[in-house]
Each structure stands twice: as C-alpha cells, then as structure tokens.
Amino acid sequence: MAEAHQAVGFRPSLTSDGAEVELSAPVLQEIYLSGLRSWKRHLSRFWNDFLTGVFPASPLSWLFLFSAIQLAWFLQLDPSLGLMEKIKELLPDWGGQHHGLRGVLAAALFASCLWGALIFTLHVALRLLLSYHGWLLEPHGAMSSPTKTWLALVRIFSGRHPMLFSYQRSLPRQPVPSVQDTVRKYLESVRPILSDEDFDWTAVLAQEFLRLQASLLQWYLRLKSWWASNYVSDWWEEFVYLRSRNPLMVNSNYYMMDFLYVTPTPLQAARAGNAVHALLLYRHRLNRQEIPPTLLMGMRPLCSAQYEKIFNTTRIPGVQKDYIRHLHDSQHVAVFHRGRFFRMGTHSRNSLLSPRALEQQFQRILDDPSPACPHEEHLAALTAAPRGTWAQVRTSLKTQAAEALEAVEGAAFFVSLDAEPAGLTREDPAASLDAYAHALLAGRGHDRWFDKSFTLIVFSNGKLGLSVEHSWADCPISGHMWEFTLATECFQLGYSTDGHCKGHPDPTLPQPQRLQWDLPDQIHSSISLALRGAKILSENVDCHVVPFSLFGKSFIRRCHLSSDSFIQIALQLAHFRDRGQFCLTYESAMTRLFLEGRTETVRSCTREACNFVRAMEDKEKTDPQCLALFRVAVDKHQALLKAAMSGQGVDRHLFALYIVSRFLHLQSPFLTQVHSEQWQLSTSQIPVQQMHLFDVHNYPDYVSSGGGFGPADDHGYGVSYIFMGDGMITFHISSKKSSTKTDSHRLGQHIEDALLDVASLFQAGQHFKRRFRGSGKENSRHRCGFLSRQTGASKASMTSTDF
C-alpha cells in the first residue's frame, strides 16, 4: 500500500560498496514538525500552568512590584527593612564593576519572595471567601448585606481574565458533614416510603451505628479530607464506576442529541468533517486553557478538573478494576463504518486539517469498498460485555492485534458512521425520536467503542449524536463541549450551498489507514458471546422521548418557582400514578463548588412531595389546598438541592463512611442497608446554554433535544429533562422491557398529564384545567403540540427525512 512506504524515514540497503541509507525527506519533515508541535505544546502547557499558579496575580504585577522596589531603592528608601542588603551579601562577589548588578538581583529576589507571599495570601483569602455559601441558601432575588459584601470582596480578589484552571488553587475542599446530621436527614428521606415497622427497624440500626461505629469512621474520613483534594470523589470514581463489572452500555453511558428540528446538511461526510473540526477546535482551546471557567452568578467559579480527560481518554478493562488511560495528545481519530475500523489523521504539517479536508477523508472511508475481516464487524461488542470478560479477551487481543488496538484506544475519540438515518421524521415523529434515542444509547451493540471517553455518531442523513462513557466526568462537562460543537459547526464553520464543508479538498492527503485485526480463533467465540449479550441488553431497553410544548421555563418563571423543583414534584405525581406507590428518587446535583467535586444526590421523594401527591389524588381537596402543598414541596426540594450543592448532602457522606468500614473490615448493618437500596426513579436535568454562543430566542429551532441514560434499576426508570428555550421541555425516559412494572410510554403520558394538572393550579395556567384532574385520561392536545414549533426558516433547512 502507498502509505506503507511512508512509515519509515530511511531505507537501508547493502551494495558492493557497502551499506547505504536512503533518507526520506518528507518523512523526516513530518518527524520534525511533529517534534516541533510537541515542544510547543509542552511550552504552552508550562506557561499556562505558571499563569494559573500565580492567579489572581499576573507576571505584570511582578514587574510592577520590582519596578516599585527599584524606584524606592533609587530614592534611597529600603522597603525591605534591610533584607535586600542581606540578600546582596549572600550573592557572589563579581567585583566592584558588578556592584549594581548585585543590587538589581537582590531587588529581583526580594520582589519575587514578596510576590510569592502576596500570591499565597490571595489564594488563602479567595479560598476563605469561596467557602461562604450563605448566598446559596438565601431566597432568590433577596440578597442579604453579608452576601453583598461577600460579592464585592470576591470581585476584588478574583483577578481579571481567568483561564480555565485559574481558580483551582483557590477552591475550597468539600466539607465532611456531621454524621449525626447525615443520619437524621437519611431517616427523614426514607420515612415516606417505608412502613412503620420497617422505619422503626431502620431507626434502631441508625442509632446503633451512631453509638458504636460512626465516630471512628468519621475520624478517618476527616483525616482524608485534610490530606486529599476531595474526601469522596476518587472513591466515587473507583468503586461506583471503575470497579463495577457490569457492561458499560446502558449501565454506564449516556447520550446527547443533535438539534431537534434542523439538520444543517444531509451529507454524512460533510457533517462529520465540520463536527470533528469543531471538536478539535474545542480541544485546542482546552489545551491552551482559553475556555473560560464556569461562574455561578457571574462570580462564583466551579471546579474545572473534569475537563482534563475529555479527549485522548479510554477506560481500560481490568479483571477486578478498570483504569482510565489519558494521553496528552493524539493526532488521529478512530472511525467505524460498515464493520471496518480506520485510523484517520486529523493533522497535516503540524496543523489541524480543514473541515473540507476532513470531509474528504470521511468520504474516502464511505467509498471504500473493502469488506470487513472475519468477526471484525462485531469486534466492538466486546466493549459492551461484562468488564471482567472483556479484560480477559483484551489481553489476548493486545498480543495478536496490538497496533490496531492502540490505534483505537489512543485516538482522540471514536467516530461511528452509521448506515441508517435518524432524527425526527414527518411520518412518525414519536417513534422516530424513540429510535433516535435508542440508537445513541445502545446502537446495535457492536458499532460503538464504549470504552472511549465519547463516540461521535454521524447518521447517513447527516444527523449527529454523542455516546459518552460516564466514569471520567459528568454530563455538564460533555454538555459544554457538545454545545460548543453544535454552535461552531453550524454558525461559524457553516456549509456551502450544496451542503459541503467550506473550503477546498486536499488531494495530497494519504488515504485513511484501514486497521488490520489478526483475531485468533479463541476470540471468535468471545465476540459471538459478547454480541449475543449486547443484543439482549440493547433490545431490552425501552427508550421514549417526550417533547412537551404547551409551556416551559417562562411559564414556571411567571409562577415565581424554581423550574427544576417544579419538574421534580410533577415527576413524583406522575410516578405515583404510574406505580401507585412512592419510591426512592435520585436527582443528580453538582458539587463543583468544591475542588474536584462531582455530584451529590437529592432525594426528591420527600414527605412534603408525598403530601402534595396525595392531595392531588384526593377529589375532596381544592385547588388552593393543592397549590399550598405544592409550594411547600417546592420549598423543601429547593432546600435539599442547596444543601447538596453546599456539601451537606446525605448519600456521598454515607457512601464514604461505607467504604471506610470496608477498609477497616467493620460490619455495619445500617451502612449495608443504605448501600443496598435501589433507586427506582433516577432523574437528572440536562444543562443548556452554558456558553451562550448564539441567542436561542433569535434561532428558536436550533435547540438541542438533550439526552438521556439507562435506568438504574431493572424495575425502575431513568428520566432526564431539558428546558429547550422558554416554551418547551423535553423528557427522555428509559426502562427495561423485561420488567412488568415499568413502561416508558406509559410514564411519559403520566408526566404530560401531571405537568398540565400542576400548571392548572396557578392563575396563569387556568386554561390547562381539565375536567378530571388525576384521572390519567389522555389529553391529545399536547401529543403533537411540539410540531407547531416548526417555522418556515426551519422547514427550509431540514432534510427530506426531517420533520
């Protein structure tokens, strides 16, 4: 093959005159450019680390300080109180003619020491300021005097033009809550779902735990909190994710969707080219720390540690425990198409390929007529197998096909060029969205490399999607990247009138490299077994997408309520109607206010929420009575959410106590019971408009339809939701078809009914009032209400397969 000749930089040969070496100038040039890029990257990383280390100060502040000291010295003033003279005495004596140089060096050393002390003081002061969470606990719109003072001080100490990791040294550590408070909150959270007998027994176990073991476990936990960056996040990653032996597919991955109404181009290769270029632009900005840190209220920074592993990252399977492999750089992506794997370079001559050049390379892969090797088509099903099984097979695969395996695992990310279309269609909008969600979550079980940090999925009609492995980071991080990608590839890079990427192709680029897998016979049976298991798991998932458009965030805002709390309480009503009982409910809340914080659980099924649900199902209760109970439930949920965000949650603390007890070989019936609980309703809100790269009000059809995840329990639901602009909410519901207790479509109908019933309690929502509140009768008005969102502009930009 032609590219094989470019694999080496010289060719030795033996002649009658001796050995000769023929150097290849193009390859040597590539080696030089690659080394130059590597050195530039190292220098850039060093400089950025220096800038973030001295933040909120800057190198200019050192120069100002040094100049001030020199000026004072020139005016025969000694701001060092004699220290500079002592420093001069310690410097070598180079003779009288260099006496002035010694003074300058002494001033520079003193300025550096003083500058370092000031930086340390700023770090400590900012860390103390950021440890204040009173602002979080105050009612929305009612800012107290201490909070106003705090905001002013944060502005003073925060510096200017922060880089992505500028605040990392100043973030406070996550506090260890009081074990008595945690146990009390836990008992309060399970009271609505336990019988009196079960609750009394749980309370006895809790008191026994507090009396016998809690103080010892808490002591070890506090010791870790003083030593480690975060007392729980590393254990959460290890024991919840990396030590789990379940398949990643459905159990530990989640998906993100493209624009709901718009597909910028129907050309698969063009969409892939722009998307990959946008993703690598994001990586470039990430490496240079040009992405600004996320700030709450425009002032309070969130931890940025999770951004480090977005790209060049793979979860490597192990027999007992996986590990995360992260490379500093990668100049290729791994591509899967029609059962074949390709290694496609993303850079040429030290520069990122243009979108048009990337489109050209993807088109070459699409046009490649070569068939898949035996069992190559289903090879990726191994990544959907139980982790221990995949680890054993990978050991053999690494021996037999090391080069191909390294090309996939060492890629910046994985790209799957699917042969089928996806997205919203005119013929059957509901079914098409459900199929779209299922394709992103599980695919066919063998067309995603689930170990990669994320897989970019490009469908045949140009629709995009993302499948994300969960261990390395949480949804807001990948959502931030995805938001940048969609906005950049559509609004900044754009497409020509014929749907191609802008620019010109590069015919000099080598063909993408087809990966060769030398698969031994013993692996064939493992692949077949993994494929069978992946298909069973994939076909068992029931995905349902509910675009609800009768009202959205603007209506909830007019009711003066938290939009997230509004949805959470409505979900309790919907789930009760679906199952006839209350259950443990998991809502993910972020703890990135702290260094290396990840998530905390909000236990949304509260006593207050249950009281509201019972009132809604009681025909004797009036609307004002239900509304009063609803407001109480919302206030309680808000209090729990704020407590979780400020490090005063329940579940991460109990989890860490349980891990310590296992290390100490202590048996705690209470912690064992807590650890064995099943979350039958797992929920999460998908963040949106984190970067504000375009105004969604001016482009209402360019809204992402969010994403979803699999259920946490075999007899439970996974529900995610996203506020699309001001007038639409999209729900992603998942469950297991094998369960006789769940039905994603049924819950979707209950969610729509519950939203309308709750809205009808408010004066602004009287037009939603229905005759039989709580009856579960279908209201067809909102079944296809989202179709009215389509505008003339969006119609013109949609492909034939889109609505």
Swiss-Prot record:
UniProt xrefs under Pfam families: Carn_acyltransf, CPT_N
Membrane topology, as annotated, equals: Multi-pass membrane protein
Coiled-coil region(s): none
An annotated Gene Ontology molecular function: palmitoyl-(protein) hydrolase activity
UniProt-listed InterPro entries:
Carn_acyl_trans, CAT-like_dom_sf, Cho/carn_acyl_trans, Cho/carn_acyl_trans_2, CPT_N
Which keywords annotate this record? Answer: Acyltransferase, Cell projection, Disease variant, Endoplasmic reticulum, Fatty acid metabolism, Hereditary spastic paraplegia, Hydrolase, Lipid metabolism, Membrane, Neurodegeneration, Transferase, Transmembrane, Transmembrane helix
Give the matching PANTHER family.
CARNITINE O-ACYLTRANSFERASE, CARNITINE O-PALMITOYLTRANSFERASE 1, BRAIN ISOFORM
- Disease involvement: Spastic paraplegia 73, autosomal dominant: A form of spastic paraplegia, a neurodegenerative disorder characterized by a slow, gradual, progressive weakness and spasticity of the lower limbs. Rate of progression and the severity of symptoms are quite variable. Initial symptoms may include difficulty with balance, weakness and stiffness in the legs, muscle spasms, and dragging the toes when walking. In some forms of the disorder, bladder symptoms (such as incontinence) may appear, or the weakness and stiffness may spread to other parts of the body.
Record remark on domains? CPT1 enzymes are comprised of an N-terminal regulatory domain and a C-terminal catalytic domain that are separated by two transmembrane helices. In CPT1A, the regulatory domain, termed N, adopts a malonyl-CoA inhibitory and non-inhibitory state, Nalpha and Nbeta, respectively, which differ in their association with the catalytic domain.
- Subunit description: Peripherally associated with AMPAR complex. AMPAR complex consists of an inner core made of 4 pore-forming GluA/GRIA proteins (GRIA1, GRIA2, GRIA3 and GRIA4) and 4 major auxiliary subunits arranged in a twofold symmetry. One of the two pairs of distinct binding sites is occupied either by CNIH2, CNIH3 or CACNG2, CACNG3. The other harbors CACNG2, CACNG3, CACNG4, CACNG8 or GSG1L. This inner core of AMPAR complex is complemented by outer core constituents binding directly to the GluA/GRIA proteins at sites distinct from the interaction sites of the inner core constituents.
Q: What is this protein called?
A: Palmitoyl thioesterase CPT1C
Species of origin reads Homo sapiens (Human)
